[in-house]
Amino acid sequence: MLRPPPPSSVLTASAAAARPPASVVQPQRQAAHRRRAETLRLRRVFEMFDRDGDGVITPAELSGALCRLGARGEAPPAAAALDAVVAAYIAPGMAGLRFAEFEALHAELAGLGGRQAVAAAEAEEEKEADMREAFGVFDEDGDGYISAAELQAVLSRMGLPEAACMARVRDMIAAADRDSDGRVDYEEFKAMMAAGN
């Protein structure tokens, strides 16, 4: 006659059957450990960037941290692209990024969004290079300014009637000349071109 197994062995056998094999559990534990370690690392970075310790990284604090790390200041178009990405993560009514937003921003920059941010920065750099090249066409002597005489010469080569009247050329310079020095520097040229688009 067969005897039924003792109740404790039935429970042990059913618990063992319900438990996933070690080959599944171990990678899950490792992944959870990596996530915790990454969160702790990000928390340390967040606290390092949050200079005043208020739990929010302002754009100024982020910019300062990136400067200290040597990742800011060399490519203004890339910096502008980064500023736009960061601004998208700042919650309405907040002065900066809280840890959860910082973590989400990090995830985007590390994943597909990071490649998109890089592509956007590269496109912005290309646009900047094109703008500098256009400025160079007008800045014939390369001194960093477009004078009325330089503008008149370029307009004349282009066959535009405005070149015939120096007063009209000076008016064109004055319209773009924000600091009233009688010539157009690169930033003024850029602002004029942006206003025209």
Swiss-Prot record:
Ca(2+) 1 binds at residues 50, 52, 54, 61. Ca(2+) 3 binds at residues 177, 179, 181, 183, 188. InterPro entries: EF-hand-dom_pair, EF_Hand_1_Ca_BS, EF_hand_dom, EF_hand_pair_protein_CML-like. GO terms for molecular function: calcium ion binding. Ca(2+) 2 binds at residues 139, 141, 143, 145, 150. Signal peptide: none annotated. Residues 1-33 are annotated as: Disordered. Residues 9-30 have a biased composition (Low complexity). Residues 37-72, 126-161, 164-197 form the EF-hand domain. Gene3D superfamilies: EF-hand. Keywords: Calcium, Metal-binding, Repeat. It comes from the Eukaryota. Potential calcium sensor. This is Probable calcium-binding protein CML21. The gene is CML21.
